[in-house]
Amino acid sequence: MKDAAEELSFARVLLQRVDELEKLFKDREQFLELVSRKLSLVPGAEEVTMVTWEELEQAITDGWRASQAGSETLMGFSKHGGFTSLTSPEGTLSGDSTKQPSIEQALDSASGLGPDRTASGSGGTAHPSDGVSSREQSKVPSGTGRQQQPRARDEAGVPRLHQSSTFQFKSDSDRHRSREKLTSTQPRRNARPGPVQQDLPLARDQPSSVPASQSQVHLRPDRRGLEPTGMNQPGLVPASTYPHGVVPLSMGQLGVPPPEMDDRELIPFVVDEQRMLPPSVPGRDQQGLELPSTDQHGLVSVSAYQHGMTFPGTDQRSMEPLGMDQRGCVISGMGQQGLVPPGIDQQGLTLPVVDQHGLVLPFTDQHGLVSPGLMPISADQQGFVQPSLEATGFIQPGTEQHDLIQSGRFQRALVQRGAYQPGLVQPGADQRGLVRPGMDQSGLAQPGADQRGLVWPGMDQSGLAQPGRDQHGLIQPGTGQHDLVQSGTGQGVLVQPGVDQPGMVQPGRFQRALVQPGAYQPGLVQPGADQIDVVQPGADQHGLVQSGADQSDLAQPGAVQHGLVQPGVDQRGLAQPRADHQRGLVPPGADQRGLVQPGADQHGLVQPGVDQHGLAQPGEVQRSLVQPGIVQRGLVQPGAVQRGLVQPGAVQRGLVQPGVDQRGLVQPGAVQRGLVQPGAVQHGLVQPGADQRGLVQPGVDQRGLVQPGVDQRGLVQPGMDQRGLIQPGADQPGLVQPGAGQLGMVQPGIGQQGMVQPQADPHGLVQPGAYPLGLVQPGAYLHDLSQSGTYPRGLVQPGMDQYGLRQPGAYQPGLIAPGTKLRGSSTFQADSTGFISVRPYQHGMVPPGREQYGQVSPLLASQGLASPGIDRRSLVPPETYQQGLMHPGTDQHSPIPLSTGLGSTHPDQQHVASPGPGEHDQVYPDAAQHGHAFSLFDSHDSMYPGYRGPGYLSADQHGQEGLDPNRTRASDRHGIPAQKAPGQDVTLFRSPDSVDRVLSEGSEVSSEVLSERRNSLRRMSSSFPTAVETFHLMGELSSLYVGLKESMKDLDEEQAGQTDLEKIQFLLAQMVKRTIPPELQEQLKTVKTLAKEVWQEKAKVERLQRILEGEGNQEAGKELKAGELRLQLGVLRVTVADIEKELAELRESQDRGKAAMENSVSEASLYLQDQLDKLRMIIESMLTSSSTLLSMSMAPHKAHTLAPGQIDPEATCPACSLDVSHQVSTLVRRYEQLQDMVNSLAVSRPSKKAKLQRQDEELLGRVQSAILQVQGDCEKLNITTSNLIEDHRQKQKDIAMLYQGLEKLEKEKANREHLEMEIDVKADKSALATKVSRVQFDATTEQLNHMMQELVAKMSGQEQDWQKMLDRLLTEMDNKLDRLELDPVKQLLEDRWKSLRQQLRERPPLYQADEAAAMRRQLLAHFHCLSCDRPLETPVTGHAIPVTPAGPGLPGHHSIRPYTVFELEQVRQHSRNLKLGSAFPRGDLAQMEQSVGRLRSMHSKMLMNIEKVQIHFGGSTKASSQIIRELLHAQCLGSPCYKRVTDMADYTYSTVPRRCGGSHTLTYPYHRSRPQHLPRGLYPTEEIQIAMKHDEVDILGLDGHIYKGRMDTRLPGILRKDSSGTSKRKSQQPRPHVHRPPSLSSNGQLPSRPQSAQISAGNTSER
């Protein structure tokens, strides 16, 4: 069975390998299919046509003027856009003319109608882009084809193709019909209302300016768009008229739409998108807006001031008048938290004069965002104001920008992360932390660093950012951030102590990002620091920084302190002083990312269950400010009525509108890491259904600001996929920009005049997850987000493709910085309002004015980011990279018309043409856009839900990159385009009504345009056929030259470091790729066939696997013949390896084929380049005289039709241009020769391709043979399987025999339960080993019993002996005491008394009346005994006067020899001590010493006897000789007569001579102790004397035991009767002896004998 299982496992592995092979085939098939599609889209040489006369006229005129600015400017807008013709309807002019274009051109650029651009019906839209001229058609490839190529190479891996010039041309008849049809429906140039700006001088630094009259746009009743009106469109005038991006105040450039226009889009005029910012614009030092040669895919110039794209009083859906509900901006007169009306502190984005709510007019107190180009230097640039007209950045350097970031403004991330913010704030300005002075604020944060921060070091940065952190909002790390953050540290304190924070937190402002998210801010303000602005003076910062308190928890580390507190607000609870539960503004333990204590994961602002009375305004319904039990990464408790998440009365720059019912500022159950937690997954910043008017602008219906249940990665989540940033159904102007450090809602690098379009529905300002880090909202087509003719330098962030960001056809000089490659900024021919940015997740740039409540792309919906229940039918194309009309990375040089017929669709060109008049937002997929799903945005008909009906259109989606197949499921929602996985085709489907409307309206307009064009060309060709033909050729040559020059520029930029030959080879290789032979398609079919065969083989293998698994289950008890099966499977392994090898060879062959194909035309390319270079000079000279030749040719025809006033007085004389005819003829001949060379080259290439085809066929044959071999192996496997089945039958028989044996065993086997029971009761050997045998135990017990009995007997005998001896000792002691205390004491006292009496008689005291006041000797007083009335001689009471220094005795000399006479030494030592302690003269001392010595001698003998007795009987406490010596020494020292002087016996000698020999003679060498040094203290302190008196000491009793006693009383020393008897007892005198060791007591004295013992000793000595 084990072998069988192994074989089955191997079979599964084999199936997996087959699956992998199948995937490889499928991938190869997709790639080949992609190549096939591209080949099918490559037009043939026969498609090259001539240009129309009308286009030729305009082209020559524009070309003449453009040539004056230099040949380089010819490439201004067609750069990287393929070989667009200079004069063809599809070719964009090399440079935009400064002359007013004809009305046909203006309308063509706005209409978007091409000859064949109406797939399934197209008649233009109802928007200004009802038709786009053929010139605009070529602008599409020029703006997108090249711009998308870099991304194509980087992301999609699709080869970058440059379309040939033939790709740009359409048939001549189609051009005529298209133009005639269009122009017939529009007013002529001379019929335009309003003044017309005539030819304006064009500055050389403005080659890309787009001419536009002041009335090029007007409103038509039958169209919901912008059309030529009397409106003064200063943004459409040549750039030379005004400084770049500067709109004259006299002109109503507040917005492109004129007043009373109900539209939300701008007219896509002819604009060269590839150089939105002219290369030579004065002041082009964009301060880092974009580095030269940097691929700033969507960087938009900032200098222009887009007020909001509407005029005051206009009901612009995206810009409402004053007092209206400016959903996303402000309402006049309200405390706009971030966006305020004019006349007040414009912290936000508002117009001062017109309540443009977020867009401000110049000359007002624009604290927020003021027009960079309209704000004079003298004005108070308190906002993002440009001090001069020439604004290289927001503010001119050196200008005093007091309020670039207005104090207290909601500057969350004034500079967006990763964006190249040239000068969000100008250097040199007093930016208090915004910028570094004198520095090029290339990003206003350090380039290359994730400096979502605001400023550079070197300024008084007020600590704007955290160094080294993810500065989503403020400054460069490691710099001198004096205030906001300590530079180079993990922000222990948000503000450095002692630093002057002039404006870190302006009073009354809401510094959302005062503390950087994720930063370590132990305290928003460090206590003791000079927090001038952290808590602004005059602001009631009760909670921001408690006065005198350590605000270490005001902003806890790891928390997102977007704005700890709002200055000017009574922050009673932000860090509530005197509130215990506000220790960190939020108690730790809760998930408070906002204002919490350090160490706790404070994802939310407060701890769940804590009533944060002050975090929101006290008195408000702050249930808990954070819902308990949830991960409150946000500020408020979901479901709570947050009338003031922040204080209602405070200037909450948009955090929460005061008085607004913030029931769910944070969606319940969502991950609220912070109100706007950067880098976090804000599933729902706001609770669904809550009226979040304050979270974004007041007055905005922010029902949830985030869709409930949607993955709201963050209200302003940087770098996250913010697809559903806002709640469906709510007018979410786009609170923030996702995809970057959106600490604030201000678009980095630009004056966010329209960051939130008033009343517009830009669903998130920037769709979450979109590449556009810029201001453009992916979900809405912000036509007027960047006004035409202005310099919104930062409107589009780098790396972002904003197709509809700028108005096509409008002059956005700075919309894109020079060198920036806007991959999706180009406008398309048709309705540009529906154009979408190219980068991913620009899903459906719907016009801002559309009522797009929650409309999001289907992909967003699939990811849970779209509003549930919202009809998002056509908000976005159904696939990932729906940012623009074309998928990034594809070759989109120009959309190819479906066919001439409006209702037909070319089978090989699955793309959409321009929509009808009612389809304002239709997007046009190009056939070359493999991998792009497109949807027609029928804003009012079939595309917008709720307008006219459902309608969708999506195209083939091949190579959709970045798309999760699991998320590309067909949507079952009504109106949502079905999403397909990569490699699948999405069918085109629309509602019949929408198609009919498109057909009817499109054909109507198209016929007019075409008829007018045909008439114009017919008139000219009839009169001047040669000239017409010549100019046709000239236009084509110009197109070829321009394309080739553009391609060479591309090569110079992209192939830097290579030789010219390599560059040319690369260019020609791409050109050759367009002519891949059709045989490759057959090869692709063959590969598909092989793939199908692989599928069939896979099915067979799966059947075999099922058979094996089924039989394996039946063979549970069988043994398989593993050897044979392994052999068969080994053969399969070898086969699989061979197949893989063949596949590898196939890949290599394909790579070789590609390389050969690229190198096939290298020789021809050199010659072609040489010829084109020769043509260059001819074309330049031809252009100089082209206008003259034209006027000469046309003069005879127009003489009778032109009025006298209409004749050009400056017309050139015909004779002046005669010399040009020869050159023209030479040019024609050269052109014919060049055409012949191209044809010959085309003929020669198929032969080489045939060879490559044969090689590919051989490779395919090998693959097929390999597959056949696999089939053979499968047959072998079938045979093996049959063998296995036979074996199975045999094993089945064996199993039957086994069953019989089992039955027999069942009868004869032992009972298992019985065995288990026996085993259980069986003794355990290991347990027995630990037990003791009974015999051993008994023997040990008996032995112990015997030993105990012996011990008892011994103890009893000893106890009897001890008792006898004790009794004897007691008897003897009693007897001795009687003898000692009676007779000897009596006799001694009697003798003493007699002696004293005798002395008194012999020497009575003499008293003199007037003697000295003091005497040396103590006086004696006469006293009588109370009992016997005997006279007594006692010394006078009082302190004894010491006569010698008191101090411890010096150590005695000790010999190494043992003592022999112990008692003698004891007496000597103490007698010496006694001699110094007496107050009597030396003679008296001698007598006293003799008496005392006798007593001590007897006492010592008694002690020795006691010691011997105790040693013999083993008393409890043995009195050893050492103890006895110490006791004797202590007794002597403790005697009262010796208290006067300490022991000085070591160096004192007796005056009485002593005899030699006797008991006092030493038997060992004795040396007197000489005082080697003085004692340390001669006089003992009074404390020591008192302690000596009252210390409790041990007393040695006569019984040998030691008792407790005190040393208070001592018997007086006994003196002899007279000094004469001293000699009789010399033997009793003490002798010096060796000093003994110190005593054991703490004070140096051991316990003394009791009085009775001392007296007894004295008596004994007398005896």
Curated annotation (Swiss-Prot):
Where do the record's region annotations for Disordered lie? 80-239, 423-481, 575-615, 880-925, 948-984, 1609-1663
Q: Where does the record place Basic and acidic residues bias?
A: 171-182, 958-975, 1609-1619
The linked condition is: Spermatogenic failure 35: An autosomal recessive infertility disorder caused by spermatogenesis defects that result in multiple abnormalities of sperm flagellum and severely impaired spermatozoa motility.
Q: Which organism is it from?
A: Homo sapiens (Human)
According to the record's subunit comment, the protein's assembly and interactions are: Interacts with AKAP3, ODF2 and TSSK4. Interacts with AKAP4.
What is the protein name stated in its UniProt record? Glutamine-rich protein 2
Q: Which residues form a coiled coil?
A: 1085-1160, 1286-1325
Does the record's keyword annotation contain Iron? no
Outcome (variant: residue 1105 to K): In SPGF35; uncertain significance
Which GO terms of the cellular component aspect does the record hold? cytoplasm; nuclear membrane; sperm flagellum
Q: Name one GO biological process term.
A: flagellated sperm motility
- Give, from the UniProt record, the effect of changing residue 1347 to V: In SPGF35; uncertain significance
Statement: the UniProt record of this protein carries the keyword DNA repair? no
Q: Where is the composition biased (Polar residues)?
A: 84-103, 131-150, 1639-1663
Show the ranges annotated as biased composition (Basic residues). 1623-1636
From start to end residue, where is composition biased (Low complexity)?
A: 206-217
Where on the tree of life does the source sit, at the highest rank? Eukaryota
Tell me the name of the encoding gene. QRICH2
Tissue spec. comment: Expressed in the sperm.
As for what it does, the entry says: Has an essential role in the formation of sperm flagella and flagellar structure maintainance. It acts as a suppressor of ubiquitination and degradation of proteins involved in flagellar development and motility.
Q: Which UniProt keywords apply?
A: Cell projection, Cilium, Coiled coil, Cytoplasm, Disease variant, Flagellum, Membrane, Nucleus
**Location of this chain's protein in the cell:** Nucleus membrane; Nucleus; Cytoplasm; Cell projection, Cilium, Flagellum
